[in-house]
Amino acid sequence: MTLDELQKQIVGLHEEVPLLDGSKRVYVNFDNAASTPTLIPVQEKVDQFCRWYSNVHRGTGFKSQLSSWVFEEARTIIARFVNADDTSSVIFCKNTTEAINKLAARFHCPAAGDEKPVILTSVMEHHSNELPWRKVGELVHIGLASDGTIDAHDFERKLIQYRGKVQLVAISGASNVTGYINPVHEYARRVHEIGAQIVVDAAQLAPHRPIDVKKNDDPEHLDYCAFSAHKMYAPYGIGVLVTAKNIFEVGAPEYVGGGTVDVVSLENAYWKDLPEREEAGTPDIVGVVALAKVIKLIEEVGFDSIIHHEAKLTAYALRKLSAMPDIVLYGDTDPGSADQRLGVISFNVKGVDHALVAAILSYEGGIGVRNGCFCAHPYVHHILGVSPEGVRTIEKHILERDRSRLPGTVRISFGMYNTKEEIDRLCDMLGTIIRKEYKGIYTMDSERGEYCPQGYSMDFSSVFTL
């Protein structure tokens, strides 16, 4: 299958959505950094499997044995997708957030009075690669360069400053705010030279670039890696932790119960080997099937085609947006380097609240974007130049349930199926907003931080019911 063919296989690609004026228009989805739609071949594979679905492991019935075989075949496909060797294990989780929390739980907190290990991370991180590590040790942040990239010199300084104390470096494969791609293998080499390990949050990277954790004896090996299927055109509730086995082979599992034990008596419990010991209860077998199918589709199309298409879209969007004087872009704005980043672009419209821009695009343009801080508050505060005092004020307002004055940006993010025509449509709507020619009168719900047009409400039940 070619990319051109796969682009036509997006579920819901031609669905129309209602607009404020009573008309309908084909939906434009520029929110792929949050989640992607599924693909028709993935949907069909799930439907096909559901005829044979049964619970996995230890069942003697044909459907149970088939489901168990499919489950483990999928694990092999996923391991191959990231080039993991037999010193690593693929553990299924709900999503990237759970995967990183599961890993963090294995890095035990020191006893009272003992020196805490240092966890190095960056200001760029998604909260899911920041908050779990706060429980583990002393979290030290690598600074950012003026363009919002990770400061390589500060990274080196921190490695030297905390040499002998750094236990782990937690870094994102790519930013969900600016689309920057981090040189994780270069980082891995340096991290291993000082005797530490590295975990890569690859949630944003996985749909757009190949992931290579490399063999265990490679200096650039990624010790741990996590990603989610819902950002890879398989939103069926599965995530993956690719992990070195040894850290999970001692002690009790994080969650205990069915499927985690070899034998239980009233006095003892003896845990299974990986990965079963860390997959308590009935797993999301359907989600695993969906992820395996989309991986095979991506491999068939090839990442080169995906990268080329998304880079063209990103360059085109940057040129169009840069030509609009009232648009403020954040991060790298050079169309010539579009192939060195992801198609994630954050911007604001001068003099217009980011939440209002997003609302007008939705209600009057049928265009789905995301606005705010994208679960990366410190990073967005940094690129917006919010002072420490400003951050304290933001915290105060939120604790008072007032989200009407929060800083943020508008984010567009491309998938392999988006088009230049959709970007043109976005820019036309932005022009309407800049000229203040939009039709609705919008009011802010201060508790939610969202704008809605007066006298209008969505009748969702006319489109879908349970």
Predicted region positions:
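Pyridoxal 5′-phosphate
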Residues: 1-466
